[in-house]
Amino acid sequence: MLWFNRNFEVPHRLRAIVRARESSVIVLAALAGAMAGLVVAGMGAAVAFMHLQLFGIEPGARLSGQLTLNPLAALLVPSLGGLLLGLATTTIARWRGSEVDPVEANALHGGRMSMRGSLIVAAQTVWSSGVGASVGLEAGYTQLASGIASKIGQAFRLRRGDMRMLVGCGAAGAIAGAFGAPLGGAFYGFELIIGSYAVASLAPVGMAALLGYLTAQLFTPDRLGIDTGTLSTLALHDILIAGGLGLIAAGFGILLMRGVAACELLFAKARVRPVIRPMLGGILVGLLALVSPQVMSSGHGALHLTGIFKLPIAAIATIFALKALASIVSLGSGFRGGLFFASLLLGALGGQMFATGMNALWPSLALNPDAYAIIGMSALSVAVIGGPLTMTFIALETTGDLWLTTAVLIAVILSMQVTREFFGYSFTTWRFHLRGETIRGAADVGWIRDLTVAQMMRADVRTTPVEADVAAFRQAFPLGSTNQVIAVDEDGRYAGMVLVAEAHAAELPSVTPLREILHHAAHVVLPQMTAQEAIAAFGKFEAEALAVVDSVERRQVLGLLSEAHTLRRFSDASERQRRELLGEM
């Protein structure tokens, strides 16, 4: 398609219309949502075809919904598939482009994503799930759908705020299509990809979610939502008990996310070559699948397996433990995908076990295991991905039960708060943290990083030799000519700063060397520093202005930056960002 070409731009007249009319952005959002629905249908069909060919399951069946698997296929397909993935990843490493996640794109890059990188991530996700690795397709769905939306925005040269919103529209359409939940998809876009709610974004994101849902349903014959069975009415005490389940889900979610990082560290410490790590992970997943086929792929099919929640609690606990281990090993060994789908199955199984255990201890409670499967599913997913309203609306659209949704809301709020308090990350931002990024969500902080000292400094600085005396300085820089003058040595290196008013003080002898009245000789800022870092430096050094040097070692003067100018530029940028967020620009 034309917008896959990074050099493609639509004609100027059409771009002008889109930038001038809000309704035009809604049209682009609808297009992004429809494309997201096609992405969901296409990737789902590709994975289903791989399962059909590689594992020999019946057409229309789901891999994780199988009661038994061919032992040879269960062992060989994930291991050989992992080996091929490792070889392919190593081969394409030089030209795959930047793989920018939608959250990272909106937080740091103003919504700009690489189409090539998004296609590769989507292909790796399809392959990983297709060969049976315990990974979720949602990562590939949102990556490719958001990448297409970003490319549409780049073709129309949308403003930064509109670009970020359109990326959120792509993700919203993908999640709405994947779960059959347009409201849940819309709030996924708001909470996790855009990072905020705004009236101006409601129509575009809502339209994208609706089109994503309708398109996916049109091209996918079976329902992609979650089957829950029949739910009975909840009692008042269920609301309170749901909060306890939310706390437990938060703790397990933290362990699950840390487990993936620990698995990666274990492979690294064992000095296992990255090219063969997926193969080793595939072998272990295959062994686990011999015990329970529900551990394979995303686990979406297991949620459709009507009898899974009717199994004895020991069997449910076994599936729960094996699925958690398979997910940790799959992601930790290098398979591509997400943890969202796995957390749905794990949370549902955990909720069932929780309700069954409580009923065994206190039969008078008469908890409904099916209802607690929904509560546990929502609470664990929020601990892993964030987005409390996303999961609340998915639960509502799945069950149509407002009373149950109230219990879900209590559970997800507590789960989210405990996870934020004791861990501080979702699975996505935890991965960013492990590679050195400091972002905690999709809120736009890229403008802060873009506003650097190099952009704000004055390059036309006035300097004076540090060997001069006060008399020579007074003659060269009369009172009122400037506020500060930078002193440099014979090699042009920064030596300190002279305050003009202080140098002209009557009580200061004219023969005084400038070296005796230098300020901030050891205090400088660097051109790559952000405005926030510069403001912190002014406060730390108690300076009204600081010299800008090329490096701490060379100390060649590049310019001068004042605190007042920095604060003004930062305030202007903040106000511009606020207006974009509210749709005033």
Which role fits each region the language model picked out?
Residues 351-357, 505-507, 519:
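Ordered, small/hydrophobic-rich secondary-structure cores
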Residues 187, 393, 495-503, 558-566:
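Short hydrophobic beta-strand motif reused across regulatory alpha/beta modules
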Residues 438, 448-462, 468, 496-499, ...:
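Bateman (tandem CBS) regulatory domains
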Residues 1-450, 454, 459-460, 464-476, ...:
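Alpha-helical transmembrane segments and immediately membrane-proximal extracytoplasmic
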Residues 464-482, 488-489, 505-510, 524-551, ...:
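The conserved cystathionine-beta-synthase
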Residues 1-5, 551-552, 580-585:
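Short, intrinsically disordered terminal tails adjacent to the first/last structured region
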